[in-house]
Amino acid sequence: MKKELETITYGEMPVQIGYCNGHNSKLNAVEYHRSSEINVAATDAILLLGQLADVAEDFTYDTSKMEAFLVPAGTGVEVFATSLHYAPCGVNGQGFQVAIVLPQGTNYPLEGAHQKVEQGKALSEDALLAATNKWLIGHAEGGLSEGSFIGLIGENLDVSK
């Protein structure tokens, strides 16, 4: 399976296969990558998705533009590089289990120096870079670490409501 994903889906690029599981019902943040991410739901899950094109010039994003999508157990979906997303949500208060396929090295610690968030502002997209191939915009209620850019405007969406 991994070899097929590397050869066909990712055009001979090495990939890493991991998982995300737990109990979540809130948006909390959005991230994006410069490459597609494959999600395969082992349990029913909800993905909250938005479009990178809707991020404002100051790198803020209006959460009312997000849409919720049910991913039934056993279903695989491609989350395009132009899609804002974050951790899946469970359905009806249940936990979720989702396998995640990304290019090798994605989400690894950064090795170089990058622009920092200054006085709550991201002066360039580089200030959003939180890990290798991972740009992140947080919500004030999302619990992200200090230094993260808090640029989600509006409600911290909750699929349990």
Segments predicted by a language model, with ranges:
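Tight coil/turn sites that cap or link beta-strands
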Residues: A73-G76, T82
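Active-site region of the double-stranded beta-helix
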Residues: M1-A73, Y86-K161
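Short amphipathic alpha-helical surface patches that serve as generic macromolecular interface elements
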Residues: F80-A81, G95
